[in-house]
């Protein structure tokens, strides 16, 4: 349904809303960039690759007209854009405080409200304005996104998992570390329940770093806060597959992509994933098994499943669930466009520092000069 352009939709790109899940009293102390949310809000125009002509998109900056014209080759059609102030909170939080904005939309159309991440703010917006919302509910989204729950679900399904343990105290963390060392592990991944862009997942390269990290980790007295420590896999391949779970329990495999991961941070996507026919069949099978389990738990909507293929060729079918739209969800029309031309697609981010503003026209001109603009 997410890509059915015959259904009118309201798109809300609320990246950053998952910070509300974090309990700042536990885990490793983090330094938050106060301007990070402004950057997240600016990314909202990637939603345009999925929009239909009857859709409404909330943005914080009007896209370049030339950019809008250029992306029509990928299926974009002009839609209604509502420009909001770019503040240091998410678009969902802004709309919650300014619900009158949504009261002015055409009430004759049956819109589906689609947030990037379904939050309690989105639920309250839709409840107060009697709008249909995409997905299950905010509580279920939070539960499925919890990395500790992902590990528990995989154990319940008796599917392959990375060797590791759940820990709810410093003592249990130290014990788990020793058990992994006894098994021959010397590098580790330590994960908190929630993370975004690599925050909350930590690569531990040696015992000295582990000892320092164990001292920094803050646990709750009632042992309700859990983390995991797992073997760090070298020479792995990171595969993401997206499934959509309908209200009647149908599970559709949307796409399989290969991820570019720098240590713990997502940097980009390769499409199609470089998989054998046997591996594709295995992912199709795992999509159904995991999708049915998530449906039984009460989840509806899109979920991205991060997986690995280890150096022995064994598929670890899920290391975490992204119970939301994924970054690569928005790029699917681009990737499919080039796949039809028998081209592989690499989509990734680069950090660029400039002395002057780098707008779309200037970027396009530079790409043309290098003969890499399509």
Feature locations, PLM:
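Conserved ATP-binding module of the ATP-grasp superfamily
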Residues: 160-162, 183-189, 205-234
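Conserved anion/nucleotide-ligand pocket segment
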Residues: 186-202
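Membrane-embedded hairpin module used as a gating/binding unit in multi-pass transport
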Residues: 234-275
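Conserved N-proximal alpha/beta basic substrate-recognition cap immediately N-terminal to
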Residues: 38, 43-46, 58-171, 175
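Glycine-rich phosphate/pyrophosphate-binding beta-alpha loops
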Residues: 321-332
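N-terminal "leader" segments that precede or initiate the main folded domain
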Residues: 1-72
């Amino acid at each position: 349904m997410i890509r059915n352009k015959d259904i009118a939709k309201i798109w809300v790109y609320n990246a950053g809303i998952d910070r509300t899940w974090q309990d700042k009293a536990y885990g490793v102390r983090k330094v938050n960039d106060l301007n990070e949310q402004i950057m997240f809000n600016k990314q909202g125009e990637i939603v345009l690759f999925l929009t239909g002509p009857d859709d409404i998109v909330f943005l914080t900056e009007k896209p370049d007209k030339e950019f809008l014209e250029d992306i029509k080759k990928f299926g974009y059609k002009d839609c209604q854009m509502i420009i909001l102030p770019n503040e240091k909170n998410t678009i969902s939080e802004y709309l919650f405080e300014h619900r009158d904005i949504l009261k002015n939309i055409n009430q004759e159309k049956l819109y589906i409200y689609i947030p990037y991440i379904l939050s309690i703010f989105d639920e309250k917006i839709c409840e107060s304005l009697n709008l249909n919302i995409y997905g299950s509910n905010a509580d279920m989204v939070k539960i499925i996104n919890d990395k500790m729950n992902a590990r528990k679900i995989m154990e319940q399904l008796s599917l392959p998992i990375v060797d590791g343990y759940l820990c709810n105290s410093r003592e249990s963390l130290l014990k788990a570390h020793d058990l992994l060392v006894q098994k021959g592990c010397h590098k580790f991944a330590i994960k908190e329940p929630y993370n975004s862009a690599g925050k909350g997942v930590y690569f531990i390269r040696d015992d000295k770093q582990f000892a320092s990290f164990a001292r920094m980790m803050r646990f709750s007295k009632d042992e309700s806060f859990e983390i995991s420590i797992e073997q760090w896999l070298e020479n792995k391949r990171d595969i993401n597959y997206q499934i959509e779970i309908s209200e009647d329990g149908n599970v559709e495999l949307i796409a399989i992509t290969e991820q570019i991961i720098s240590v713990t941070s997502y940097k980009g996507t390769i499409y199609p994933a470089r998989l054998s026919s046997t591996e594709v069949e295995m992912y199709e099978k795992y999509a159904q098994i995991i999708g049915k389990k998530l449906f039984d738990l009460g989840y509806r909507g899109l979920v991205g499943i991060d997986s690995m293929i280890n150096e022995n060729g064994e598929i670890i079918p899920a290391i975490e669930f992204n119970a939301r739209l994924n970054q690569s969800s928005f790029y699917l029309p681009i990737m499919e466009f080039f796949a039809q031309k028998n081209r592989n697609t690499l989509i990734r981010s680069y950090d660029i520092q400039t002395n002057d503003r780098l707008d779309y026209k200037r970027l396009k001109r530079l790409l043309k000069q290098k003969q890499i603009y399509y």
